[in-house]
Amino acid sequence: DSVKTEESVEGMQEAEHAHDHSKEVSTFEDHEVQDRSLSDWAGSWQSAYPFALDGTLDDAFAAMAEEGEMTADEYKTYYQNGYKTDITNIDIEGDHIEFTYEDGKKVGSDYKYIGYYIQNWSTGTKAAMYRFEAVDRTSGAPIYIEFNDHMIESAAPEHFLIRMSNESFDAIVDPENSW
């Protein structure tokens, strides 16, 4: 089973951008992390992967290159690898997630909250990975999923990173390069 990843881009979700940027954190005390419900990510989300491929994000990569340590092409390759997925859309309502694949196939399941995992990055920062498990393990929907939206408490995100596996949470490998 391969791990699938996806990120949505700002402006591609159903709801208006409405969170407080002060809640976005990459350094925090572990005890500050709060449990969250799937409803925090409610809405219709679109993968950023096609935009990394088709040139839509090229201006962003160029701007990053002006400030960063890589060229625009290196950033583009880096993000293409991190965003890579065959899922085009994710729809979240209540405890239910429906995944739409490139071929149009749709699969979904209700999910139960398992808890959070604190991911320590090599950069010295960290993230709260909110974990959910499919209730219907035979639906074809990913069984184990983790959300990261750079927040540690309930809030409506402007985007999120999601990692998935049908094997286990431990099978979600290479967190530095697979978002």
Regions found by a protein language model. Name each.
Residues V33, F51-A52, T85, Y101:
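Positively charged, hydrophobic/aromatic-enriched amphipathic segments
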Residues T5, E10, E14-H31, I92-W179:
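Calycin-type beta-barrel ligand-binding domains and close structural analogs
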Residues D35-S37, A48-D54, T71-A72, S178-W179:
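General structural signal for secondary-structure boundaries
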Residues F28-S44:
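N-terminal helix-cap/turn-to-beta initiation motif at the start of protein domains
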Residues D58-Y111:
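N-terminal glycine/threonine-rich, aromatic-flanked beta-hairpin/loop signature
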Residues A42, Y49-T56, Y83:
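Sec/Tat-exported extracytoplasmic proteins
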Residues Q46-L53, H96, E102:
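Generic short beta-strand segments
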